[in-house]
Swiss-Prot record:
Ranges of biased composition (kind: Polar residues): 1-13
Region (Disordered): 1-32
Family per record: Belongs to the FGAMS family.
GO CC terms, sorted: cytoplasm
Gene: purL
Binding site for Mg(2+) 1: 114, 561
Residues involved in ATP binding: 68, 112, 523, 560
Protein name, per record: Phosphoribosylformylglycinamidine synthase subunit PurL
EC number: 6.3.5.3
Origin organism lineage: Bacteria, Bacillati, Actinomycetota, Actinomycetes, Mycobacteriales
Organism: Mycolicibacterium paratuberculosis (strain ATCC BAA-968 / K-10) (Mycobacterium paratuberculosis)
Amino acid sequence: MTVSPTSAPTQAIDTVERAATTPDEPQPFGELGLKDDEYQRIREILGRRPTDTELAMYSVMWSEHCSYKSSKVHLRYFGETTTDEMRAGMLAGIGENAGVVDIGDGWAVTFKVESHNHPSYVEPYQGAATGVGGIVRDIMAMGARPVAVMDQLRFGAADAPDTRRVLDGVVRGIGGYGNSLGLPNIGGETVFDACYAGNPLVNAMCVGVLRQEDLHMAFASGTGNKIILFGARTGLDGIGGVSVLASDTFDAENSRKKLPSVQVGDPFMEKVLIECCLELYAGGLVVGIQDLGGAGLACATSELASAGDGGMEVRLEAVPLRTAGMTPAEVLCSESQERMCAVVTPENVDAFLAVCRKWDVLATVIGEVTDGDRLRITWHGQTVVDVPPRTVAHEGPVYQRPLARPDTQDALNADSSARLPRPATGAELRATLLALLGSPHLCSRAFITEQYDRYVRGNTVLAEHADGGVLRVDETTGRGIAVSTDASGRYTMLDPYAGAQLALAEAYRNVAVTGATPVAVTNCLNFGSPEDPAVMWQFAQAVRGLADGCVALGIPVTGGNVSFYNQTGSAAILPTPVVGVLGVLDDVSRRLPTALGAEPGETLMLLGETRDEFDGSVWAQVTADHLGGLPPKVDLAREKLLAEVLRAASRDGLVSAAHDLSEGGLAQAVVEAALAGETGCRIVLPEDADPFVTLFSESAGRVLVAVPRTEESRFRSMCEARGLPAVRIGVVDQASDEVEVQGLFTVPLAELRQTSESVLPRLFG
């Protein structure tokens, strides 16, 4: 059903004039999520009570999701620690729809991660699908063509009854939306832990490519310029959606009742919207642009107006509707998907509308930029909003929430995994390898990733099973990018500062093992309730750890997202800072794959230092359901050195494959690389080393590399000259069909593959 945008109002409207003459009329501000002092502040700003529409607008824009009111005081640390040298390649940063980075030759890349956690529990398919759609529009709004997506997923225990429902819907939603858009899904993570039952994490990343001169920003300037809403019609879906769902906690009884707040996506509408936007940009028809996501038009109009040099007037009745009888507040705050808002000069309006007609995209002039400093919104000639736009979009409440290191932290850190019994014999070590590989934590993700198209558009160079996704940007020069996202809630629980740095280090290392140079960071910080001092301590520590880590590595945070209230009842999730890193390759033909066997008789070498570090490890989780102690040591200077060596080795052809060591340690890395290359190998452990520690330690800053026999001496010399530990630990044997750890055990590749690939189909197939 479509509804004429000129449908007359059918009920009395609370206008600004009426609000001024009825100061004592009760208003349901508490039901909309506003606290009493916040409501009183709105009255002070306006000099009267707000209209119903203004109240709705302030409530969504001052929500935790939109205003960052609990996190802003800590997030400032990113800007305070970013040096001019770190900013040198950044074309747009924190505060924009997405960060934009110069990658050379006139090209730029924009990338960002956002959460859609709470909607994805309430309605998994639409929650995940619209999460992809929303982050894609953020990228479109910067003037870029979206070229790839990635995802970070966290679910409850793999064998928990509700995990099947949530995982099935989320994976189908991501695949259904991304595949329909023609965007390759080039990587990510899927993690299972009981703490995410009832509160999954669905963090979607999108990457876009643009020429630097095509960069667009979100601002409304130029008196008389027109405001054009284009894309899908506006309906009731998503009323109080992500802006409210992401600002509240779940409980087991009422979560399913929130279904109407989840948006409904149409990827085919978004596909034509992408092409329409790109043609509008190419024609020079856009002054400023903003996507409509959380808080809908309330957000788009207030952000555009507050970022410009004037005011704005909007005629809300002009908005094309698909549902009859919507109130002004509903139209303003609807989170219906696949919509954009553009600022266009009067002389370009006809050309703009013509492009939209070509792509069968509905476009409507709904207002204009004014020379004042107010955002005025009318409904059939009656003023329902008259506000200073910055007070809505940027000057909401800011809280210095109490924070306190938990009383339980000392006991948690004292409970080391060192007390757990360890395997010693060859048979026990073999059984441990298979137990980890056959657990939901380390098994193959093919059951999930094969539902995504990884190679559509033809520019994917590396995807799953590689550590980082690699895309070709310029077909002539071979210039490309590498992207990775990583997180570890277990490490962050043990030490939030170090845990955030470990996530950063792993994402940085995953980009480096492709041969790329890491250049920029984005993040999505998933935590429990900000009203819990222990959670705020975790959050503050993680932010400082991430910011200090970026300084040590010399790469900037370009933007990000905060998701609070990730808890069910009073039980918070593990603190989960997701970190995305972008890298640049001069020539993607020199990228380093994960798979062994590219060269006959490759030498296997382990780069970095292995220590006895099992606290927070997958081994401790699988064998004893244990979480305690201290996370692995972080050495960011060593990570930087490791990246430099890998880049030089890739450039000079000294390494034929590389694979990051993380969960499951060396044993898991060897198995994954051998299975990817469908080739056997023989591992020879150092004589003076503890086999268990060498095989399963999760020490950071390590990489397994395959070195062509003819280059072993040169590569060793390079590592020695730079002070990077490099130990020969085996050889690739293309004639073999097994992984052998000499003197300890042997496992056929077929058994490894069956063990790894059978787990998720058994649980969720």
